[in-house]
Amino acid sequence: MTNDQPFRVLGVSGSLREQSRSVIALRILLDFAAQRGAQTRLLDLREVDLPLYRPDRESHSQYEQRISADMDWADAVVLASPDYHGSMSGAVKNFLDYVWEECSGKLFGYICSSHEKGLTVMEQMRTAVRQCYGWSLPYGVSTDGRVDFDAGGKLKNERVELRLKMMARDLVVYGPLLRRQFLSDFRSAESETFAAIYRKQVRAEE
């Protein structure tokens, strides 16, 4: 990112269900981020037919190219997943397997649709992102589709709405600080930084 361009927030929807409550919450968050001047984009994994990740496969489909381009575009990312037996959806995990390099030095937020608060789901997403050199907000947003939305799918829980607004604000405020410093560290010769560890690994794989 540069000082003269808007901050860019990518929302990644990891539910393959139509009218998913997690993606509804994600859209609301992206709207709040846009109100704060961010450029936003939604990557709906329902529309991306990603094969299971195979590190030894050399060919890259148009869908793989799309998710890589979207992640390259993003300065910050919000992952939204349903709670599947206490874990993130397979779609989200498969997505992260593809994009570890593109996660580096970016701030992440997490949304989970769950009737049990989704704490283990968000912690698993946070752990995976940390291993991909990403940074995470210290909280997430949990929604319960049974009580937080009306019959038409509209969010009715004001506390959840306020939490989504808070996350949008924090992404737009803290995200640029982190992104600019990480890019500066990555381009420098300084060796005692988190970015230097990532830089060393990237160059080892070139």
Model feature map: region roles:
Residues 45-62, 151-152:
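N-terminal beta-loop-helix "entrance" segment that forms/cooperates
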Residues 36-41, 134-136:
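A generic structural motif
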Residues 57, 62-135:
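Helix-loop-strand module that forms the ligand-binding subsite of alpha/beta enzymes
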Residues 2-37:
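N-terminal beta1-alpha1 ligand-phosphate binding loop
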Residues 3-5, 137-206:
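Glycine-rich phosphate/pyrophosphate-binding loop and the adjoining helix
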